[in-house]
């Protein structure tokens, strides 16, 4: 996916809260929106080179979104809204298994009963529901999710597990950086999520991880990654 904007370099100073940070842009301190609910403690550190996207709405509170951060071995996609757009493209191209067979329709933000899922996929002979999670934390060779406790993520897994006997269900982890080789749940951070993920897999929910490639022009599919539960 090519960016429809030109990333603007800045230097990160500090987070004011979960969604607001301070950067130095062209010699001036500026407040920016951080479109990611994670802690990002290992990524958004003082002095980190980051890249911004200028907003098109003149009435918005913060003029810029913090989209990318430069780690020693890789750029990191901080914007957690973009991975769903990337996932939709991968689904439509038949890259994400087990949805690689003939797809009639991919619909975003769909409800099933009381549950809301990132995607509903209509295959010729079956319906599928998918949740997408963006992964930014890496320790050694491992990409880890989550980087903060996520009761909402646990609920998503329980909902998918409940549907798995009647529908194709999957959790897709998009690794938003290039310096990881294996995905596993972050059981130290959120043992409830790790346990729910294992139970979902045992019930037949597909657990998939795909690594992305990044540069200042866009984000691209790299390869499927090993998942260790």
From Swiss-Prot:
This protein's source sits in the domain of life called Bacteria
Entry-linked CDD domains: SfsA-like_bacterial
GO MF assignments:
DNA binding
Tell me any Pfam family this protein matches. Answer: SfsA_N
> Would you identify the family this protein belongs to, as annotated?
Belongs to the SfsA family.
Query: Which NCBIfam families does the protein's record reference?
Result: sfsA
Name of protein: Sugar fermentation stimulation protein homolog
Q: Which organism is it from?
A: Carboxydothermus hydrogenoformans (strain ATCC BAA-161 / DSM 6008 / Z-2901)
Q: Highest lineage ranks of the organism?
A: Bacteria, Bacillati, Bacillota, Clostridia, Thermoanaerobacterales
């Amino acid at each position: 996916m090519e960016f429809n904007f030109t990333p603007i370099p800045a230097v990160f100073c500090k987070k004011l809260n979960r969604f607001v940070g301070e950067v130095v842009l062209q010699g001036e301190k500026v407040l920016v929106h951080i479109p990611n609910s994670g802690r990002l403690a290992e990524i958004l550190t003082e002095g980190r080179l980051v890249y911004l996207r200028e907003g098109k709405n003149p009435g918005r509170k913060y003029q810029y979104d913090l989209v990318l951060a430069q780690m020693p071995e890789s750029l990191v996609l901080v914007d957690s809204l973009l991975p769903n757009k990337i996932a939709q493209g991968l689904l439509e191209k038949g890259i994400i298994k087990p949805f690689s067979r003939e797809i009639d329709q991919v619909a975003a933000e769909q409800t099933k009963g009381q549950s809301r899922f990132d995607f509903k996929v209509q295959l010729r002979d079956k319906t599928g529901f998918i949740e997408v999670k963006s992964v930014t934390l890496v320790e050694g060779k491992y990409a880890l999710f989550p980087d903060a406790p996520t009761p909402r993520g646990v609920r998503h897994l329980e909902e998918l597990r409940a549907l798995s006997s009647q529908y194709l269900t999957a959790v897709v982890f998009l690794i938003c950086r290039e310096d990881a080789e294996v995905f596993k749940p972050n059981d130290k951070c959120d043992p409830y999520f790790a346990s729910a993920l294992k139970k979902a897999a045992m019930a037949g929910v597909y657990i998939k991880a795909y690594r992305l490639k990044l540069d200042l022009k866009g984000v691209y599919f790299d390869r499927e990654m090993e998942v260790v539960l």
